[in-house]
């Protein structure tokens, strides 16, 4: 397995890995009923991931894991607060074709509040916003290996000592 920072020319590929991995994730699926056309949920998830991946790549905080030359996992890390302006500058306006601006901002605020709870309850240098593994490789140890051999060394290389994360899936806890 090879680990490295993602490149801007890989936004679509990395976003697809994230979208495939998180399509049924509760944080995302709860927004489906708020879409203008709920049947466009998959397209919305992909567009949202493109925004997040593009922003993370520009901040040098998107890592990928490659197996046999294919990206099979991605990690989006956060070291600083991301403003709504950052999202808008990285394509969030594209999301308005799927959801009203009010509902999208409510969703972003919900996610931000969840992250704020983590900030208030623990100290950490980096926040693992997302660890996505393509469905074929899920629950085969790829995510754990990526954390140990890719994400941890990256955090240490920046002078970081701790990593915070949130999950609402029991099977994600023991890595």
Where in this protein do the model-derived segments appear?
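Residue-level recognition of the GNAT/N-acetyltransferase active site
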Residues: 134, 168
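A short helix-loop-beta-strand connector motif used in the catalytic cores of GNAT acetyltransferases and
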Residues: 43-64, 123, 127
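Conserved GNAT-fold acetyl-CoA-binding loop/helix
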Residues: 26-49
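Conserved acetyl-CoA-binding loop-helix of GNAT-fold acetyltransferases
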Residues: 133, 139-153
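Conserved active-site alpha-helix within GNAT-family acetyltransferase domains
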Residues: 157-158, 169-175
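A short beta-loop-alpha structural element at the N-terminal edge
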Residues: 2-29
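Conserved acyl-donor/pantetheine-binding loop and adjacent beta-alpha core of acyl/acetyltransferases
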Residues: 71-131
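Conserved hydrophobic beta-strand within the GNAT/NAT acetyltransferase core sheet
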Residues: 128, 163-167
